[in-house]
């Protein structure tokens, strides 16, 4: 297998974008929506190929997370997927590690939302499960997002976070987290 490639969305060919969508659809089934795919675009992609076949992917996009009265420049991880036949071989960790320098040098916070199944990967990579509340800045104001509580991982690059204060994500279509 080749090393992990890093490419901005603008550098990807239509075939690359189609391969990302196909991989994510296979990994997540009906839970991966058009909005989820859209969320993964506009930033950098970590891509792992086996020959010409995309077998692992993770995207890092810029977002603003409000916390303690500040709008934190956040590298938000999206669309982490590994082909079913090569799972548990370190490919998810490889694409995540490839994004680490971009988070460390480009943002004050790294964040991601995950399922229970994905949580062990992020914990093993040094991400911290956010213990505090979550919310979203919606068109109707700040609204709690209790469904996201317990499923957000963070990597604080630019200082400590106060778990007594909520993490408030910016608004977007589909799942806000």
Predicted regions: what is each one?
Residues 1-14, 167-176:
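Conserved N-terminal entry element of GNAT/NAT acetyltransferase domains
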Residues 6-81:
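A conserved beta-strand-loop-helix scaffold within acyl/acetyltransferase catalytic domains
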Residues 20, 122, 127:
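Conserved active-site tyrosine of GNAT-family acetyltransferases
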Residues 77-87, 117:
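A short, internal acetyl-CoA/4′-phosphopantetheine-binding micro-motif in the GNAT/acyltransferase core
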Residues 86-98:
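Conserved acetyl-CoA pyrophosphate-binding loop and the N-cap/start of the following alpha-helix
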Residues 101-115:
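Conserved GNAT acetyl-CoA-binding A-motif
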Residues 113, 128-154:
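Conserved catalytic-core motifs of GNAT/GCN5-like acyltransferases
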Residues 143-177:
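Acidic/histidine-enriched, glycine/proline-rich intrinsically disordered or flexible terminal extensions
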């Amino acid at each position: 297998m080749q090393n992990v490639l890093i490419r901005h969305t603008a550098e990807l060919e239509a075939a690359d974008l189609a391969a990302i969508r196909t991989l994510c659809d296979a990994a997540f089934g009906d839970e991966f929506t058009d909005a989820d795919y859209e969320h993964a675009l506009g930033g950098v992609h970590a891509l792992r190929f086996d020959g010409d076949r995309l077998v692992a992917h993770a995207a890092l996009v810029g977002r603003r997370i409000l916390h303690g009265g500040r709008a934190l420049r956040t590298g938000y991880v999206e669309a982490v997927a590994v082909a079913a036949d090569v799972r548990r071989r370190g490919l998810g960790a490889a694409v995540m590690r490839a994004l680490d320098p971009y988070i460390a040098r480009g943002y004050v916070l790294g964040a991601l939302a995950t399922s229970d199944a994905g949580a062990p990967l992020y914990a093993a990579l040094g991400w911290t499960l956010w213990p505090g509340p979550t919310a979203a800045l919606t068109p109707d104001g700040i609204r709690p997002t209790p469904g996201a509580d317990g499923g957000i991982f963070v990597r604080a690059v630019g200082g400590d976070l106060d778990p007594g204060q909520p993490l408030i994500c910016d608004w977007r279509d589909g799942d806000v987290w």
